């Protein structure tokens, strides 16, 4: 809708009448849905709203910005065993593609869109695998916050060790 027709998001309901547009400053966090994607910056989604999402049956929350979810809301999702992915994991695609572009430029290469997509897919799969590796709790719940933090720490620690600093 946005990319092809340059339409407004609220026009989505014209084509899909079962959808609901929430506009005029209202927040979508009190609506029923399976997936929530907070994508505004810092503290968009709070504890009260997280409780409403859980009560309404959300099964996954993935950040699409830097810290749009408050610590209280994160706690609500984790206590309810909702799949919660922090922005450092789920929003890493844009930064990753920027890095790929810098690599292309420095090596004087030109990758096709398909090659970039394949590299991005590998990066995002690797992020997920590391979150699962380092974030799986004894009960099987994957704590993506813990997984992403430990994976990041391990990457830096291995680099420091490889340089002989420790």
Regions found by a protein language model. Give the residues of each.
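Adenosine-phosphate binding glycine-rich loop
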Residues: 52-166
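A structured beta-alpha segment of the ubiquitous adenosine-cofactor-binding alpha/beta core
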Residues: 1-49
